[in-house]
């Protein structure tokens, strides 16, 4: 697993993590599961 893989997998989580979204996007959960 590379840093780029981690970055791509977790990118959909950024709005939630930074407080701009009230809940994680479906892609966030999928990205975490991929890791």
Curated annotation (Swiss-Prot):
This is Non-specific lipid-transfer protein 1. The keyword NADP does not apply. It holds the Pfam family Tryp_alpha_amyl. GO terms for biological process: defense response to fungus; killing of cells of another organism; lipid transport. Disulfide bonds join 13-28. One of its GO terms (molecular function) is lipid binding. Transmembrane segments: none annotated. It comes from the Eukaryota. Keywords: Antimicrobial, Disulfide bond, Fungicide, Lipid-binding, Plant defense, Transport. Gene3D superfamilies: Plant lipid-transfer and hydrophobic proteins. Seeds. The keyword Amino-acid biosynthesis does not apply. Plant non-specific lipid-transfer proteins transfer phospholipids as well as galactolipids across membranes. May play a role in wax or cutin deposition in the cell walls of expanding epidermal cells and certain secretory tissues. Inhibits the growth of F.oxysporum and P.infestans. Belongs to the plant LTP family.
